């Protein structure tokens, strides 16, 4: 009986050893997962490698590959930057850490570019989420005003949610005064009231704020023209009358 028991234990041990995946197996399996667009499985296998073999020579590759998945497959800026930072902190002397440092330095630029790419692909919610992540986590960064302005632009031109667009443009005014996006946001607020909502009193007020605040802006002549002919039919505007004649 004891011999049988020992044989069963030995068989189970052999089976366990044969089934246990080593670091190279997990790396290869993760790549196979990605080739089949099974990124969640790839993430699981890479995390298994990092948990079981944190000091393996392939660990830095696994950590950096996680960052790549969050960047290129998941469009997940939070986990992307977290994975990059882990690559640098846990494997500081690796080639992957060197590359991760470069990507950390250009992280905010990547968010803007990725958001625009997502927008072109009609992945509007993902685009907005990327931009909001930048604004909320890096409010003092030089690209934060641009990110906030693009959010307003998406609501204006893509989603056609004009009240929300007004709200997002006003965030630019309140949080990023002095930025180049401030004047553009003020103009767009007046434009929406004048040309979309047809609230000419509100449009006049917002346009006047623009004229007073940005007297040297390139849009100044356009705003003066808009104010002069607010609410008028095209036939009542001498400069445009020829269009309908």
What positions do the PLM features span?
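Sec-dependent bacterial lipoprotein signal peptides
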Residues: 1-19
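Acidic, polar-rich low-complexity tracts and alpha-helical solenoid repeat scaffolds
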Residues: 3, 18-245
């Amino acid at each position: 009986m004891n011999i049988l028991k020992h044989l069963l234990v030995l068989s189970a041990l052999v089976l366990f050893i044969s089934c246990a995946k080593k670091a190279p197996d997990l790396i290869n399996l993760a790549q196979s997962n990605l080739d089949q667009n099974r990124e969640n499985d790839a993430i699981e296998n890479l995390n298994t490698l990092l948990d079981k073999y944190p000091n393996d020579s392939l660990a830095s590759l696994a950590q950096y590959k996680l960052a790549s998945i969050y960047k290129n497959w998941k469009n997940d800026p939070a986990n992307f930057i977290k994975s990059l930072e882990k690559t640098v902190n846990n494997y500081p002397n690796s080639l992957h850490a060197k590359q991760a440092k470069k990507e950390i330095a250009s992280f905010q630029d990547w968010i803007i570019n990725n958001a625009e790419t997502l927008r072109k692909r009609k992945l509007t919610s993902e685009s907005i989420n990327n931009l909001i992540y930048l604004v909320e986590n890096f409010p003092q960064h030089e690209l934060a005003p641009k990110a906030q302005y693009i959010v307003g632009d998406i609501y204006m031109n893509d989603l056609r949610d004009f009240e929300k667009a007004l709200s997002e443009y006003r965030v630019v005014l309140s949080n990023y005064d002095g930025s180049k996006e401030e004047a553009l946001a003020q103009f767009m607020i007046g434009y929406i009231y004048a040309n979309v909502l047809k609230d000419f009193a509100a449009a006049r007020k917002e346009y006047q704020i623009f004229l007073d605040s940005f007297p040297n802006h390139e849009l100044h002549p356009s705003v003066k023209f808009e104010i002069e002919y607010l609410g008028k039919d095209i036939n009542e505007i001498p400069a445009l009358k020829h269009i309908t004649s």
